[in-house]
Amino acid sequence: MIAFLLTLSIASWAQQSETRSLNSFRGVKVSQAIDVYLKKGDKESARVEISGGQTSDVVTEVEGSSLRIKMRDSRNFWSKVNVKVYVTYVNIEKISASSASSVFSEGQIKADHLDIGVSSAANVEISVDANSVMVDTSSAGEAVLEGKSPKLEVEASSAGDVDTYRLESETVVARVSSGGEAKISVSKDLEAQASSGGDIRYRGNPGRTNTHSSSGGSVKKSN
């Protein structure tokens, strides 16, 4: 009997995987400590890998134009498992990560405009090639971007962190507050505002700069 229960216990903690077909979507929204890996393809799908639970514990459903990825049980159960979801997208315009989740790109994400939101200790690390990018981090969320985007808009608050030193941008608008931090590279036009302990560091030699700092905020050129 003990051996049987031990076998069941080991089986429940073994890694399980499942590949799912998905309806069309243009955005991805992930939460609850799930790691998501994005890859471009010809048809939308998701491969779920889980240790310490069942694949049925992981929800991958398209709501409107967004793919929602979360745990079926909203209680603290999800903190005891390890979940990775490999998402194949056709086109993507929006990425949202919260509650200690992470999003990574396998290859460069190409888009006209890309909207990125990161909050509650979540993390986004991606490579992009887009005409414009909007990044908003808060509550210890972190975004690290590389690649190219002529137009970049950054907002960071409540200890949110944005690092785009490796993202080539021509025009940048950055607003940082409440202990937020932004690191940016800009070549032509910079508008930067930092307040309430917010910190902005920029690289490059923009032809025009319009900066403002208040309440302990800081905007400085970096080496």
Could you describe each region identified by the protein language model?
Residues 1-223:
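Intrinsically disordered, low-complexity terminal regions
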